């Protein structure tokens, strides 16, 4: 085959992926809302018909009216801000420590030998069961609540980051080394992209564990927070306020998870995962 013949050969045509139909995406969003809406409608109907006693489980409309009243007088906003502050501090402390130790254990042999064994032993202990000991160590004030959130967030991030680093194909690292990439470049272009999917999964699990820990922490000698609001309402049999607190926690967890998933999609644009059909 001559040179001109090669030059005139047409380039192979690579089919572009079919664009997703906006109408299909919109329809799927409506389907995702169908089951929660149906559940709320059934709950409202059962409460209004008397199948559910109001003192046991008030109607959603009653809970929303209570929420509007507490939001209007500033009560809900004050307690919500305190809960968000505790959750943010705990996530920052627990997540930062998990990132540092997970990276050390995943990247360094010495770090694996020194860090991973005690962490593996500590994860067998239910951190919520450590409340009596934590009260002795850090007191019964704000430190206890932040520590519980930090412990809840630490383990999911640590183990997913550790597993994400260890699951990277070593041949990719060797290929990068052969191409002349230094340690920092290999970390940036090979290790970090390979570990990010697992890290985002760990973040999503950590968010859930953090809110669960905060629910418990705010019921131990708290003076503010959504958990305190629920405990105070329980003393006066205000079931609507208790259910409102649970709803606030659920919405906070959902909003946090959606935020992490959005950041994951924006960060991992190169990753094509399996889509549900």
Regions found by a protein language model. Name each.
Residues 1-37, 258-277:
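Transmembrane alpha-helical segments of polytopic membrane transport and secretion proteins
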Residues 19-25, 49-93:
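Periplasmic/extracellular loop-to-transmembrane helix junction in inner-membrane transport proteins
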Residues 76-80, 84, 114-122, 161, ...:
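Hydrophobic alpha-helical elements at and bordering transmembrane segments
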Residues 89-119:
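Transmembrane-helix boundary motif in ABC transporter permease subunits
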Residues 109, 166, 201, 243-277:
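C-terminal transmembrane helix and the adjacent membrane-cytosol boundary/short C-terminal tail
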Residues 117, 160, 164-205, 226, ...:
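Short cytoplasmic-facing helical segments at TM-TM junctions of multi-pass membrane proteins
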Residues 120-156, 163-164:
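Generic hydrophobic transmembrane alpha-helix motif, especially the helices
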Residues 147, 151, 183-217, 240, ...:
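Transmembrane alpha-helices
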